[in-house]
Amino acid sequence: MTKKRHLFTSESVTEGHPDKICDQISDSILDAILSKDANARVACETTVTTGLVLVAGEITTSTYVDIPKIVRETIQGIGYTRAKYGFDAETCAVLTSIDEQSADIAMGVDQALEAREGQMTDAEIEAIGAGDQGLMFGFACNETQELMPLPISLAHKLARRLTEVRKNDTLSYLRPDGKTQVTVEYDENGKPVRVDTIVISTQHHPDVTWEEIDRDLKEHVIKAVVPAELIDGETKFFINPTGRFVIGGPQGDAGLTGRKIIVDTYGGYARHGGGAFSGKDATKVDRSAAYAARYVAKNIVAAGLAEKAEVQLAYAIGVAQPVSISVDTFGTGKVSEDVLVELVRNNFDLRPAGIIKMLDLRRPIYKQTAAYGHFGRTDVDLSWERTDKAVALKEQAGL
């Protein structure tokens, strides 16, 4: 059966989107705790609405952090600094409801040995079980330099640029909330050939005209980000297609941590296990194993063993070894998928404590991942984006 040309779409959102405000608050609290207590257990959820922030969850730590202060600093950094936005850092109410981690969960994860970070023997790593059951996916492909699908890569770059031109006053009438969406056309061989559609919706000052926004975003955002060779006379642009976007942020929509899991990962191009990332420390495999799966997939593609690779990991609560590891190369593999699974087992320690050690995940590195994607980032140094295993994988595969 011959393949046909087809379209694929992914979206991103700016850091001022209500759900992303929540992700950033949750990860800012996580970072503040990890900077003082590397072995803390954190599961921190945030919700925002007009004039209100609620932080809830389970935190077990030997340190203290000023949660309302962190919340206000995060909101201020995003740009909600005026009461007329319907939400601002100084006047919003901040409520907290924090408990300790359940003793039943801790029993499956805790070991006194865990405090000896970096000194754990294999037996000690084996003794630390996963904090929950679940399945996680990681993906990589050779469509972009960062080995990510092109639609989500462009959508993130547009969203980041939208924030840049707001914060550097190139377009001072912009306000923090915004969304981007990119549709890419793929040829018969599954290669991206052109951008078919770009959608940008951005919050703005009430006095600016739609014509001005349309002109400025094409000039200062789209042209600055999307390679000219991907845009042609047939490319469609929808800039603020409703015509007006003044009420936004938490005044326009309530926000919640963990509600942008597709934006956070691969834009729908790969499968997703359902677990969110933000506000969770690295003993939560929802986060750490998804990072490890990306690390594995990226190294497989970087090694030239496949053009595309999707890795699935699965865990049982309290058990260290993954209950399953699978690799799908969508017919692009240079070696069989059975061989790839064996290479993965031999080169990556995918037990929870092994992942933490391998990727050095007990550091306060998470707030920077809470907007514009956790994968394919070229603006920050993330351990799971390294391709340091590629040479060994290629050699062991005999290529």
UniProtKB/Swiss-Prot annotation:
It is found in: Cytoplasm. One of its GO terms (biological process) is S-adenosylmethionine biosynthetic process. It comes from the Bacteria. Keywords: ATP-binding, Cytoplasm, Magnesium, Metal-binding, Nucleotide-binding, One-carbon metabolism, Potassium, Transferase. Its cofactor is Mg(2+); K(+). It is an enzyme of class 2 (transferase). Homotetramer; dimer of dimers. Catalyzes the formation of S-adenosylmethionine (AdoMet) from methionine and ATP. The overall synthetic reaction is composed of two sequential steps, AdoMet formation and the subsequent tripolyphosphate hydrolysis which occurs prior to release of AdoMet from the enzyme. This is S-adenosylmethionine synthase. It comes from Bacillus thuringiensis (strain Al Hakam).
